[in-house]
């Protein structure tokens, strides 16, 4: 078979990409999409894991798109070898939206894959515009980019409000952009009012009591981060834990099963109007937003299919905003690795009523988008490595600070 010679990298290209897929149709489409994108450079393609490994060792790509099911050496077998051959390379699994595809994808993420893109099943790839957008977006989000460090809220000394307009480039409080109105077929849901960020260093005092709810948001790199965090929890956690992880339907159910095996807590997909139990982990099902309501008996999960927020459903912002409303600040919000800025405005609202916000650090995040947005807005009470995040949450879950 003729080897694909790498094309010259354009000056503004941000990443060099290798595509490994045994399907000629899928491989052809993905290589064409990468070639057409000026931010990416296609350096090669391969038909199975063995050939892909040889090319990876030779070409040293920044990013690899790796199919799951292949002859000779499948994606799961090739994954650890590729990670060893090209340290620092980010691998995106290309998997189908099936139970088998979901199982393998979650396993791959736990083994070190950075993310996944859900491709249509065979015969439907010709019109796979959503797959194209998703794949290219994730490849560019995973491309190596230096991001300067930012201070945590704890590092910021109290200061009086400025008497003059802020200098150019100074942080500006942003209001929440309301989602578009729901379609006629979707149930009407309560809108959350925008909350401006209090002046830095002069916000509502932090609530250091045991949180009534622990809320976690994550996206790219989230499954592995969640696994590490949940594994750190003891069996006697007294707060319910609610999670919004950007994932499609079916995959979130499989994720819950894997998280249950990883630690001492029971993890499950949340059900509509399900009462939250202390020490249980509830994951927003794929394609549903999850918010929290409260009555005299306790807290309940509420699911809806109102339009995506921040291009996501489930989204982190509505979850955090609802937690802020029902707990009035007696809550802990955690923003883990992920691309974009989902969770920033929810963290702003939660913090404005006295809640505590933790963000994952840049060094251990697969993509420092979501936690970086929270940190850069001055909303993080603490920025922690993934290794420190679980113990940090547990400490605060017991009423520590």
UniProtKB/Swiss-Prot annotation:
Biological process terms in GO annotation: chemotaxis
Disulfide bonds: none
PROSITE patterns to which the protein is assigned, alphabetical: CHEB, RESPONSE_REGULATORY
Biased composition (Low complexity): 166-176, 185-199
Protein name: Protein-glutamate methylesterase/protein-glutamine glutaminase
GO molecular function per UniProt: phosphorelay response regulator activity; protein-glutamate methylesterase activity; protein-glutamine glutaminase activity
Gene3D superfamilies for the chain: 3.40.50.2300, Methylesterase CheB, C-terminal domain
Enzyme class: hydrolase
Free-text function comment from the UniProt entry: Involved in chemotaxis. Part of a chemotaxis signal transduction system that modulates chemotaxis in response to various stimuli. Catalyzes the demethylation of specific methylglutamate residues introduced into the chemoreceptors (methyl-accepting chemotaxis proteins or MCP) by CheR. Also mediates the irreversible deamidation of specific glutamine residues to glutamic acid.
Name of the gene: cheB
Gene Ontology CC annotation, any one: cytoplasm
CDD domains found in the cross-reference section: CheB_Rec, REC_CheB-like
Enzyme Commission code(s) on record: 3.1.1.61, 3.5.1.44
Family: Belongs to the CheB family.
Active site: 219, 246, 342
Reactions the enzyme catalyzes: [protein]-L-glutamate 5-O-methyl ester + H2O = L-glutamyl-[protein] + methanol + H(+); L-glutaminyl-[protein] + H2O = L-glutamyl-[protein] + NH4(+)
Modification after translation, per record: Phosphorylated by CheA. Phosphorylation of the N-terminal regulatory domain activates the methylesterase activity.
Pfam family, one: Response_reg
Region (Disordered): 146-208
4-aspartylphosphate PTM sites in chain numbering: 67
Localisation per UniProt entry: Cytoplasm
Top-rank taxon, per record: Bacteria
């Amino acid at each position: 078979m003729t080897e694909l010679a790498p094309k010259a990298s354009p000056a503004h290209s941000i990443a060099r990409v290798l595509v490994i897929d045994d399907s000629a149709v899928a491989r052809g489409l993905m290589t064409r999409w990468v070639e057409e994108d000026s931010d990416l450079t296609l350096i090669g393609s391969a038909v199975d894991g063995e050939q892909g490994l040889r090319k990876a060792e030779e070409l040293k790509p920044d990013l690899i798109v790796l199919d799951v099911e292949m002859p000779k050496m499948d994606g799961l077998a090739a994954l650890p070898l590729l990670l060893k051959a090209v340290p620092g390379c980010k691998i995106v699994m290309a998997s189908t939206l099936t139970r088998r595809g979901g199982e393998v994808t979650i396993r791959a993420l736990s083994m070190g894959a950075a993310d996944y893109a859900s491709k249509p099943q065979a015969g439907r790839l010709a019109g796979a515009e959503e797959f194209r957008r998703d794949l290219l977006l994730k490849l560019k989000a995973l491309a190596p980019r230096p991001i300067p460090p930012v201070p945590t809220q704890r590092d910021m000394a109290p200061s009086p409000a400025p008497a003059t307009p802020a200098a150019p480039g100074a942080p500006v409080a942003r209001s929440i952009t309301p989602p578009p109105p729901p379609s006629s077929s979707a149930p009407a849901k309560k809108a959350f009012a925008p909350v401006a960020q209090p002046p830095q260093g002069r916000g509502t005092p932090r609530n250091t009591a045991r949180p009534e709810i622990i809320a976690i948001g994550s996206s790219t790199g989230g499954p592995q981060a969640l696994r590490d965090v949940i594994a750190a929890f003891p069996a006697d956690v007294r707060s319910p834990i609610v999670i919004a992880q950007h994932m499609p339907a079916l995959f979130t159910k499989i994720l819950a099963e894997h998280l249950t095996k990883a630690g001492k807590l029971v993890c499950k997909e949340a059900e509509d109007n399900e009462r939250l139990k202390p020490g249980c982990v509830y994951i927003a099902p794929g394609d549903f937003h999850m918010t929290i309501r409260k009555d005299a008996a306790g807290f309940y999960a509420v699911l809806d299919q109102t339009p995506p927020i921040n291009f996501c459903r489930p989204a982190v912002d509505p979850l955090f905003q609802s937690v802020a409303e029902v707990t009035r600040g007696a809550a802990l919000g955690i923003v883990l690795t992920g691309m974009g800025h989902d969770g920033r405005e929810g963290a702003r609202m939660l913090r404005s009523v006295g809640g505590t916000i933790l963000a994952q650090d840049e060094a251990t995040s697969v993509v420092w988008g979501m936690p970086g947005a929270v940190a850069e807005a001055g909303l993080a009470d603490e920025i922690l490595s993934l290794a420190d995040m679980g113990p940090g949450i547990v400490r605060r879950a017991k009423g520590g600070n």
